[in-house]
């Protein structure tokens, strides 16, 4: 707990441990869920095991490769882009603070505690945030929410009554693609009518020429 107060002193600019305790009490008194406005929740994300999420480095590389132009743009693209920007900046500031703590702590054991705490606790939260918003931008928010619900139902079902393999996010959009393909013939039905309607016009245009 003292280590957490030390992080609060650095990140929240609290001058003393007592002030950091007051800051901690204020933070814990607020019911803030970063996923609420997107239709999800921290509890829903907690159904996914910690080893499910890629490393922060892999997630940052993915975000940079797919959405770097939009993330660096001064324009507002979407709420997911904004949240992804904030998560990336938060991780950068956290790494800067940890580097400062590591350079100023002479005790190797204390430095190791800081690194382990950041990687196991704060690192997991950042990985969850990055994965959620990257997935929403890649597959669509509704698809991600459907996947979280499906995985939550699967993981809470006894092994004897559930499929052997967990749901896979990348396979969910295929069902929507199939549905769209099923609707496509209905959209294509007017095309023969257009061809039939065009044929009399051609005959009418040709009839004066034949009379002449």
From Swiss-Prot:
InterPro entries: Hepatitis_B_virus_capsid_N, Hepatitis_core, Viral_capsid_core_dom_sf_HBV. The record marks 183-184 as: Cleavage. It is found in: Secreted; Host nucleus. Coiled coil: none annotated. Residues 25-27 are annotated as: HBEAG. Residues 165-212 are annotated as: Disordered. GO terms for cellular component: extracellular region; host cell; host cell cytoplasm; host cell nucleus; T=4 icosahedral viral capsid. SUPFAM superfamilies: Hepatitis B viral capsid (hbcag) (SSF47852). Keywords: Disulfide bond, Host nucleus, Host-virus interaction, Repeat, Secreted, Signal, Viral immunoevasion. Pfam families: Hep_core_N, Hepatitis_core. Residues 1-19 form the signal peptide. Its main location: secreted. Residues 184-212 form a propeptide. Gene3D superfamilies: Viral capsid, core domain supefamily, Hepatitis B virus. One of its GO terms (biological process) is viral penetration into host nucleus. It comes from the Viruses. Sequence repeats lie at residues 184-190, 191-198, 199-206. Residues 184-206 are annotated as: 3 X 8 AA repeats of S-P-R-R-R-R-S-Q. Residues 178-205 have a biased composition (Basic residues). Phosphorylated. Cleaved by host furin. GO terms for molecular function: DNA binding; RNA binding; structural molecule activity. Belongs to the orthohepadnavirus precore antigen family. May regulate immune response to the intracellular capsid in acting as a T-cell tolerogen, by having an immunoregulatory effect which prevents destruction of infected cells by cytotoxic T-cells. This immune regulation may predispose to chronicity during perinatal infections and prevent severe liver injury during adult infections. Homodimerizes. This is External core antigen. It comes from Gibbon hepatitis B virus subtype ayw3q (isolate Hope). The lineage of its organism: Viruses, Riboviria, Pararnavirae, Artverviricota, Revtraviricetes.
